[in-house]
Amino acid sequence: MVKTKIPAKLENLESMLQFIRNGAEQQGFSGKEINKIQVAAEEALVNVISYAYPDDGGDVEIRCNAKGAEGLVIEIIDWGIPFDPLSLSEPDIEAPPEEREVGGLGIHIMRNIMDEVSYKREGDRNILTLVKR
């Protein structure tokens, strides 16, 4: 397992995604699959950057664990306000955009790209886990 801890700021997003790209390459995913993994991870990371620390900044820790047949396990950890993104209802993607509720589309994208998406609150940490096989 490799991990990095970076200030949760938009200007660090590219280096966060590169870290995840490196983990996916190590697991042997194709370029197309890596791009999809990065889209899912970007949705999660932008949520952390935008909402985890409303008053002042904080860090995000990213762990990538290449597990062979079990796939790539990405953990996105923050110490921000407790929030389970999976508790949001699925968006009605069939509805016209002007009739859709705000929010939830990023989680929908993550769930459709990744094989598993899970959340847990552990002590003072939010842990979002993304798995791709």
Regions found by a protein language model. Give the residues of each.
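Glycine-rich phosphate-binding loop
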Residues: 99-114
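Short helix-loop "hinge" at the ATP-lid/N-box region of the Bergerat-fold HATPase_c
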Residues: 48-52
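Flexible, glycine-/charge-rich segments associated with ATP-binding catalytic modules
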Residues: 1-5, 111-133
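Glycine-rich/acidic phosphate-handling loop/turn and adjacent ATP-lid/helix
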Residues: 74-101
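Helix-loop-beta hinge of the Bergerat
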Residues: 2-31
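Short beta-strand/loop element within the Bergerat-fold HATPase_c
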Residues: 59-70
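Conserved short strand/loop->alpha-helix "switch" segment adjacent to the catalytic nucleotide/phosphoryl-transfer site
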Residues: 20-42, 99-101
